[in-house]
Amino acid sequence: MQITRIPTTDPAEMDGPVQESTALLREGVSTEYEDKTVRSSEVTFRPGERTKFHTHEGVQVLYVTEGTGVVATREEEQDVSEGDLILFSPGEEHWHGNTDDADA
């Protein structure tokens, strides 16, 4: 078992190469597990915000803690809401973001 304490930080606007907008990012942790780097962050997408199509070297796990959103690949688009867990495979081109209703 490995436990990592996540520091409490204030969210800050992020503006990276995969962003269509400036979502709010609360940095989480980056740790090593079985020779792999595992990262976590809390991201809040304001109404209408989303990422551009992008990929990751490893699996990306999204967990919707509140609100509604949209996740998409080149082949499909799905609505998601509080309690949904989404997995993207390594190299799978995708985007994710919010609907136009409220923060998510």
Model feature map: region roles:
Residues 40, 61, 87-88, 101-104:
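A short hydrophobic beta-strand segment most commonly corresponding to one strand
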Residues 1-37:
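A short, N-terminal "cap"/entry segment at the start of jelly-roll beta-barrel domains
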Residues 42-46, 55-73:
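Short, conserved beta-strand element in jelly-roll/cupin
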Residues 97-99:
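Asparagine-centered strand-capping/turn motif at beta-strand->loop junctions
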Residues 74-91:
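Short acidic-glycine-tyrosine-enriched beta hairpin
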Residues 26-27, 39-56, 90:
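Conserved short histidine dyad/triad with adjacent acidic residue
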